[in-house]
């Protein structure tokens, strides 16, 4: 067995751990000490071929009995691998071979793989097709942050301006780092432009945060309090997530309107973005009309994949809404718990001040301090519940609405194609009736007209079929990308959320363990 198997080559580029051994060290002290070998034999200082293969991922060698073949245990390894001899030529093949990476122990491979995954990709001048090919890995060297919310103006004419900072090495941008000031309506205008360009052809455009009339009215006319500050912070975080999702899309990243939004110091004011304007009311009417059309159109779905995905997103939407409501209730519960804990701490402190017993008074005062710290922990955990978990669910509820929107546009595209086919059929029937009519004076002119109309509608039918096939192909690709992003986002947020819970519980344990000696000291 051993004679038929050649040991794997050892690279001479890097010394292995065995070469660091001194001549006097015995490599197989625990195993070879029981063997009866000649003092001049180099077997104890040699590396057997079986031991080399045992460290690899290949098949395990047949187990050798020490009592049966003691003399042949190291017979094949005495000349191939010797730690005492610097020569390694005997273990190399005599046939010419291409350059091979030196074989290293398996324990040294893992750090190299980690270092490769940690290296940041360098992205320079790329075409749209190249960026779309990298969409599966979502490798885009661009970072976007929204910060420094600032109130501009007074009264009902006031608005909030946000600083949008971009850092990138993509050559499509004029600078590697730049920042601009944008108001909320600018974000809505950007989404409106992108949706009008890409939504009807099957691209999933990330939705912008919804406009809140009540919240913004408080910010405009009210003083700065905790509720208005919390509203501004929620909106800032939502705008940042919106831009980050938008620039992750390989097609949207190439759009000139997006680049203008990120780079241009002066941006034309977005129009038709107000909720109570005429355009806002028109959008509401159009949404209602689309809902009615969706109920009346009966599409003969021939693709089982689309039927399955539509049902999947309907169920996912319902479950996300239920979970979001539960998390919102959890956030309210933690805030209420924080308020009750603060009230308890205040009462314990007052009781400690009125207590005559020194040890008990000190213990009550310490208990009040612990409860104040726990109150702070409950507040921090409530923020984590909201900003990590609740906002993620809220974002994906809107994203699923965008996904359902592209499915609706596919249905509209099919309806347009179907209408063109029906019209073409009617034109051909009219031509057939004209051919059997006994009016030779008018038949030639009418025949030419109807033939032109038939050719026109034939072209429309062909175009409708191409559009339907193209939007179906795009939606398949977009849904696959959406699913990958969804799993990645949920994994990241769940891990961070669990880490915050663990950290909170560990801090609680520390607080109570520190207070326990004070309670035991009461005498």
From Swiss-Prot:
The gene is SNX2. GO terms for biological process: early endosome to Golgi transport; intracellular protein transport; lamellipodium morphogenesis; retrograde transport, endosome to Golgi. The keyword Ribonucleoprotein does not apply. This is Sorting nexin-2. It comes from Macaca fascicularis. The modification Phosphoserine is found at residues 97, 117, 119, 185, 277. Keywords: Acetylation, Cell projection, Endosome, Lipid-binding, Membrane, Phosphoprotein, Protein transport, Transport. Residues 27-50, 93-104 have a biased composition (Low complexity). GO terms for cellular component: cytosol; early endosome membrane; endosome membrane; lamellipodium; retromer complex.
